[in-house]
């Protein structure tokens, strides 16, 4: 769990472990009702995904999620593919191409892989993004003056989900003369399943 000291500051043990290892796992931050809300809303969004990459309609013939957006929202992959690995995407941060097993013949030609900009489609995702305890952790790591700026949902369905190799996020400040361990910010990763 997230632990705060008597002054309301994030436990120093947590900050020290994060500094030493580069990650920290919080468990039971989101309550079961919050997780259920996330799962339900994600499934509702999925029913409104386009029928195929670049499609404007969902399987029910309605305008697809993000069809009216200028920026890309849904990234697709071939089933069990690794579209990022070994590529120049994101400044080449996914350095290794993962093995791409052959998917079952019954799988669809394309699988949803990444949903970008979920906050514009989901009240529940917005609530998680603004979760008071998570914002307190962000403040403890980044200081009071920080700006959350990105959200990405990776979709990994059984039997068709794409692979993502180990990588370090942040790709713009590694060579900075003012480099410090917090220069690239950090991520929260909420696991829905």
Model-based region annotation:
Residues 159, 185-189:
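Short gly/pro-enriched beta-turn/loop segments at secondary-structure junctions
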Residues 1-20, 27-181:
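Non-heme Fe(II)-dependent double-stranded beta-helix
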Residues 191-193:
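Short, intrinsically disordered, charge-balanced linker/junction segments flanking boundaries
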């Amino acid at each position: 769990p997230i632990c705060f000291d008597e002054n309301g500051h994030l436990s120093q043990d947590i900050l020290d472990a994060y500094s030493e290892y580069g990650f920290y796992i919080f468990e039971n931050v989101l309550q079961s009702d919050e997780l259920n809300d996330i799962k339900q809303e994600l499934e509702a969004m999925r029913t409104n995904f386009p029928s195929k990459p670049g499609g404007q309609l969902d399987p029910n013939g309605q305008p697809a999620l993000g069809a009216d957006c200028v920026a890309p929202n849904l990234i697709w992959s071939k089933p069990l593919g690794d579209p990022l690995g070994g590529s120049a995407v994101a400044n080449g941060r996914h350095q290794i191409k993962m093995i791409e097993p052959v998917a079952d013949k019954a799988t669809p030609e394309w699988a949803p892989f990444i949903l970008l900009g979920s906050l514009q489609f989901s009240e529940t995702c917005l609530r998680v993004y603004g979760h008071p305890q998570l914002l307190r952790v962000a403040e403890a790591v980044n200081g009071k003056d920080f700006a959350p700026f990105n959200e990405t949902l990776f979709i990994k369905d059984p039997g068709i989900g794409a692979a993502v190799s180990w990588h370090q996020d942040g790709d713009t400040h590694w060579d900075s003369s003012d480099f410090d361990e917090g220069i690239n910010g950090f991520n929260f990763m909420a696991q829905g399943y």
